[in-house]
């Protein structure tokens, strides 16, 4: 493994509409082929739909709540010990937790059948707020894997 200097984290600028860095990261995950204006419109419109469905609430707060519901507490990592590979349960850092939650919500939204990405994203965010949907299922599967491999938790590093 290379022993290079530690690469500094890039600073994420806050969102122009709501002043939230989490929202900026989410827009960047939705973005395809560098079309940020399109991605922003999709995310803002989807959040408007979610706020209307929930009858109130702050846009950024609802997004954070959805991400909190979808983010996993534990995940499994492969660890090789004496020729055998074990799936070792490991706690998830908060940054990785939100990154995984965003990734899972975007993936689940892209697989949905509604017409237009805005409606698909709105549907997935609504489902995430109500603890249902594909992204929540992915979280539960991850937790189930960690629970099943709890016996190997002493291999943690």
Curated annotation (Swiss-Prot):
Q: Name one GO cellular component term.
A: small ribosomal subunit
Cystine links in this protein are none
Under the heading Gene3D superfamilies, the entry gives: Ribosomal protein S7 domain
Q: Which domain of life is it from?
A: Bacteria
Q: Which Pfam families match?
A: Ribosomal_S7
Q: What GO biological process terms are annotated to this protein in UniProt?
A: translation
Q: Does the keyword RNA-binding apply?
A: yes
Q: Which PANTHER family match?
A: RIBOSOMAL PROTEIN S7
Q: Which family does it belong to?
A: Belongs to the universal ribosomal protein uS7 family.
Protein name as catalogued: Small ribosomal subunit protein uS7
Q: Which organism is it from?
A: Hydrogenovibrio crunogenus (strain DSM 25203 / XCL-2)
Which gene is annotated as encoding this protein in its UniProt record?
Answer: rpsG
């Amino acid at each position: 493994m290379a022993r290079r200097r530690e690469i500094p984290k890039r600073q994420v600028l806050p969102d122009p509409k709501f002043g939230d860095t989490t929202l900026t990261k989410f827009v960047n995950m939705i973005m395809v082929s560098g079309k940020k204006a399109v991605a922003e419109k999709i995310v803002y419109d989807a959040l408007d739909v979610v706020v209307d469905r929930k009858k109130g609430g702050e846009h950024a707060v609802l997004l954070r709540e959805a991400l909190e519901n979808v983010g996993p507490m534990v995940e499994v990592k492969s660890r090789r010990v004496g020729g055998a590979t074990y799936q070792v349960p490991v706690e998830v850092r908060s940054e990785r937790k939100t990154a995984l939650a965003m990734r899972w919500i975007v993936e689940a939204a892209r697989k949905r059948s509604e017409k237009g990405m805005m409606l698909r994203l709105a549907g997935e965010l609504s489902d995430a707020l109500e603890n249902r949907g594909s992204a929540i299922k992915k979280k539960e599967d991850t937790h189930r894997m960690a629970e099943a491999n709890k016996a190997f938790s002493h291999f943690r590093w």
